[in-house]
Regions:
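Accessory terminal and edge-of-domain segments that mediate assembly/interaction
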Residues: 1-305, 313-492
Length: 492
């Protein structure tokens, strides 16, 4: 069959509708998305069943659109929920079921701040069949050559022209008709990350919570599970379930979690709360590449904050093993984000996050004021991409570390903070000193065991408590203007 001659078949075309009720706009988005995804899924199933394709099947993502003609400025205190100039703004939307709360909130802000209606219709961006069937656990898109026809001749596949970070990186240009971006990510970019999250973490995107902890050791996972089970035993805390890799869900403190035959690269664990207001812990392993990968994909979920709670090398003789390090600046030698965010761009500390972390340390350790300085130091954290940096000539690295006033060194924190800055996700870092390589205290098995046994529990609890403090803040305070550039998307 010559698939180039196949006719094009699409779902029935529909007119754009305008809404002044956020919920009605979300409902319409869900209807359009389901229509497109079901259309592609049905034809894909027929093709898998051996039915020869009789057309090229194409469906489109839904989109939202608004137009404002007024130069009246929105409240200058707002970090999101408004556009800066008159014009037409649009965004393609995927998985409106997953993002329903987020979309309702963004629509309500735009309607209130600009007095406009939200248009919902069909975009001109094709939906790849891979993403249309992504929620079907019983379906897999076969590799090219497995079917007796070329998949790309019959269905649309992911397009790198729309799977990129141009919007958040500030290099996206308006559409030919002048329409500007309304959201930080395109629908295809979001779908790509949702698929990657499932692959890397072995949990579905709908389980991720708005407050994310990153760690680099299994010890923290064990403590998080213990905390989660205790939390489920106390309904007053408001947590409803705990999800482990493999989408294993328990809602009672004694629920069984089975070990997976094969663990994912970055296993994630989710202590759920109504409205996704719980806490997710991701064990990203070691290295800036993993840190970038995890944050690249979690960012599309638009979390309210993410924190790194891991271990570091203490660089000062006055530090002791087990001391905490609160990062207020970063020396970026991770070399994974240089093309997206040059190293000359400062990554500032965020006051709301810093205060939440410091208060959490004080609560858990029962130390206040000047006494708190005995076990916690605030300063610059250096992140490098060479775990065995100690084996090279020390003069260069040590000089740079001294010039930067660094007090700790690791392989993930600056990457996570820099990507938080890039993606407008509030970020922070609280590390625990596990070794002092410049002072002869290396990370050795026996030393590590004693150290982890006494320190990990407190460190994890501090991270959880800080997240609970951030959760209690208004969104307008957490998502501050510090992370916004000259021309920002209206969506958070």
């Amino acid at each position: 069959m010559n698939h180039k001659q196949l006719r094009l078949e699409t779902p029935p075309l529909v007119e754009r509708e305008y809404f002044t009720d956020p919920q009605h706009a979300v409902d319409r988005l869900r209807g359009l998305y389901d229509q497109a995804a079901n259309f592609l899924t049905q034809h894909f199933l027929r093709a898998l069943g051996g039915e020869a394709p009789q057309a090229r099947y194409r469906a489109f993502y839904p989109e939202v659109r608004l137009t404002t003609t007024s130069h009246v400025k929105a409240d200058s205190r707002l970090a999101f929920g408004h556009v800066t100039l008159p014009g037409t703004y649009a965004a393609t939307i995927t998985r409106p079921d997953l993002f329903a709360n987020y979309l309702r909130e963004q629509f309500a802000l735009l309607m209130r701040n600009h007095g406009v209606s939200i248009g919902v219709g069909v975009s001109d961006t094709p939906m790849p069949v891979h993403f249309a069937v992504a929620t079907r656990t019983d379906l897999n898109v076969p590799q090219e050559g497995v079917l007796d026809f070329s998949l790309r001749d019959v269905f649309d596949v992911p397009d790198l022209n729309t799977v990129n970070d141009d919007i958040v990186n500030g290099v996206a240009v308006p559409a030919p008709d002048g329409t500007q971006q309304l959201a930080p990510f395109t629908a295809q970019r979001v779908d790509y990350s949702l698929a990657r999250l499932s692959h890397y973490t072995a949990t579905a995107a709908e389980h991720f919570q708005n407050f994310v902890l990153f760690t680099n050791y299994q010890f923290y996972v064990d403590e998080f599970e213990a905390f989660a089970r205790a939390a489920l035993a106390n309904p007053a805390l408001g947590y409803s379930a705990f999800v482990a890799p493999g989408n294993q869900i328990i809602d009672s403190p004694d629920g069984e979690i089975l070990p997976l035959p094969k663990m994912p690269q970055m296993p994630s664990y989710h202590l759920k709360r109504e409205g996704s207001q719980g806490i997710t812990l991701v064990n990203i392993g070691v290295g800036p590449s993993n840190a970038k990968t995890a944050t690249d994909h979690i960012a599309v979920l638009r979390p309210h904050a993410w924190l790194m709670v891991g271990h570091c090398a203490g660089l000062r003789n006055s530090q002791s093993l087990g001391d905490f390090v609160l990062a207020h600046a970063y020396l970026r030698e991770d070399n994974v984000l240089n093309d997206d965010l040059p190293v000359w761009v400062p990554v500032p500390p965020l006051a709301e996050v810093q205060v939440a972390l410091e208060e959490a340390v004080a609560e858990i350790t029962q130390l206040q004021g000047y006494e708190l300085k005995r076990i916690m130091r605030t300063g610059t954290v250096a992140t490098i991409d060479n775990r065995n940096w100690e084996l090279r000539d020390q003069s260069g690295p040590i000089h740079r570390l001294s010039l930067s006033r660094a007090i700790a060194l690791d392989m993930e924190s600056a990457t996570i903070a820099a990507n938080g800055f890039r993606f407008r996700v509030p970020y922070g870092t609280l590390l625990c000193v596990s070794d002092k390589p410049l002072h002869g205290e290396l990370k050795l098995p026996g030393m590590a065991t004693d150290f982890y046994r006494t320190q990990v529990s407190n460190h994890l609890l501090i991270g959880v408590r800080a997240m609970e403090k951030l959760r209690d803040m208004p969104l307008s305070r957490i998502h501050s203007r510090k992370l916004r550039s000259f021309h920002e998307t209206a969506f958070m």
